[in-house]
Amino acid sequence: MEHMDQDTSKRFKYWQTRTIIATMVGYALFYFVRKNFSLAMPGMETDLGITKTSLGLFLTLNGLVYGLSRFVNGILADRMNARYYMAIGLALCALANFAFGFAESVSGTLLGWGIGKNQMQAMILFMGVMWVLNGFLQGTGFPPCARLLTHWIPPKELATKMSVWNTSHSIGAGLVVILCGYIMGHYGAGGWKYCFFIPAAISFAGAIVLFIALRDTPTSVGLPEIPGTGAEYKKDGKKETSAENKAFLRRKVFGNPLIWILAIANFFVYIVRFSVLDWGPTLLSQSKGLSLENAGWLVALFEISGILGMLFSGWATDKFLKGRAHRTCVFCMLGSALFIFIFWQLPSGAPVWLLFASLCAAGFCIYGPQALIGIAAANQATKRAAATANGFTGLFGYASTIVSGVGLGALAQHCGWGYAYVAMIGIAVIGMLVFLMMWNAKADGYEEEQV
């Protein structure tokens, strides 16, 4: 760091790297206990007789509660210790997954074993409660990360380094679909419960590691704050009052038209992303004739391509567009629509490499905006409100599960997968048009704060 002496700079870089790696691993594990559901769905449908519409309702309720939780926890995380917040939240998510896996046993114990209507209803109700609870607890994952990263990474480096960090989404989702794909391939439809038990055990262990590895801010380890990022807002050593904080949030988040545009765009980005991620195994097996194990691998490759897309989009944003992440998103959404169209047009007997290439190209494109929206929101709101801004955009993002969850499930069940593909393409185009609305916006809101 330019403003620090050599020893301080060395210590700062060590803690910066440690924070990035620890939060990457931690957030990947949040996906272990969230995206395991998509691979368990076909088994639950076969083994338990749960309909696609009901499974889609689980996804929708989980997503809505998660989006609301991210918003609430975003406001809280800006003013609390991120280390405790993230570690405890991950541990509780793991416990909720353990409980979900025991749903059949719980309903059988309470109402007697069998396949009666009452037991089925009780089991579905218990599953729904546990998955909604998990959705709420998942909201303790990203907000503390947004706080940590904006305190440890300078704004001019944020797009590149946070794009690297954002690969945790794809690493976590990719690894868990491979793991659960293997479980379902090995145990068959009845193995769905192990898709919850095994990821939960891994995540609980990870929560302990997070608690040991993380620290909240540079000052908590005796290091200076990054200059030029509003660190001076605690003037004369006085703590910011609640009224001052609320006024700042109104101006930089809730009354900021750029944050609203990013939030609305996030709604469309997440519909496309979750349509593939949540329904991918079912869609690929039913519309393209792949086995569940191979479908799991293809969804994992979609995630891996997303990693490359995030890294490239972050690098291109800083290198060519001077940090204007919203401009990169325009091109990414156009590419997403194009490659989903190509994938849709491939026949069920098409070579696997063609299916691979087109779906991976779509993943490469859609994960650029998924990563960059958080970066753009953090920069526009400044680090004082980074978690709140990301919670707000996340609220819109996970409201998208109304469409990608129960909406897409009902559309596929009643009209077929062809209509679902058309919906995804149209939504990607709308998302591109929303991003175009802020084409001329500046890269961040720090300059405005210093005027």
Question: What do the PLM-derived regions correspond to, one by one?
Answer:
Residues K35, G63-F71, G139, A173-G174, ...:
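Residue-level signature of mid-helix packing/kink "hotspots" within the transmembrane helices
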Residues A91-M120, L334-S348:
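C-terminal ends and interior cores of transmembrane alpha-helices
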Residues G323-I373:
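C-terminal transmembrane helical hairpin of 12-TM major facilitator-type secondary transporters
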Residues R79-L90, K319-M333:
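Cytoplasmic membrane-interface "Motif A"-like loop-to-helix N-cap segments
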Residues W165-P218:
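Helix-loop-helix hairpin linking two adjacent transmembrane segments in secondary transporters
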